[in-house]
């Protein structure tokens, strides 16, 4: 499971391909914040990031318990839920001073596949899917959107 974090690091980062359905670019495969801050993705990323109001009490709880956490985040730049939730996730991660080297961001195509198959065996059927690991063991998931709050 967690071996996906490190085995795929030699692949192309922030690979953009043409999406026939939307007639624009979409990211596929391993990505990072820098990819989301490039056009055309920066339009929705920056808007949602800036507009999200943090729950400061919840952020403090997360900050106190995030030391041994790592995250796999599957998303689609073509997906409305991903466009809404992923910038908010980054806002929370920034607020808790999360080390982004412990975040693996994988962009999927419309069929929920990535070029290197990082999703294989992880039961990814919807995006975004955020998987939390503590000491290399999965401890939770948020799929599409949270029930109450991302924090």
Give the ranges of each region predicted by the language model.
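Structural recognition of the beta-strand scaffold that forms the well-ordered cores
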Residues: 71-73, 104-105, 132, 141
């Amino acid at each position: 499971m967690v071996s996906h974090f490190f085995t795929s690091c030699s692949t192309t980062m922030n690979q953009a391909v043409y999406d026939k359905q939307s007639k624009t670019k979409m990211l596929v495969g391993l990505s990072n914040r820098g990819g989301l801050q490039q056009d055309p993705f920066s339009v929705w990323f920056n808007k949602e990031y800036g507009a999200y109001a943090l729950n400061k009490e919840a952020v403090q709880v997360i900050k106190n318990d995030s030391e041994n956490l790592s995250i796999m985040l599957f998303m689609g730049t073509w997906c409305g839920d991903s466009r809404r939730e992923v910038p908010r996730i980054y806002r929370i991660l920034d607020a808790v001073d999360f080390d982004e080297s412990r975040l693996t961001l994988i962009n999927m195509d419309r069929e929920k596949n990535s070029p290197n198959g990082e999703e294989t065996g992880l039961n990814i059927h919807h995006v975004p899917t955020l998987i939390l690991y503590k000491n290399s063991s999965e401890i939770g998931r948020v799929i599409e959107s949270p029930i109450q709050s991302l924090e």
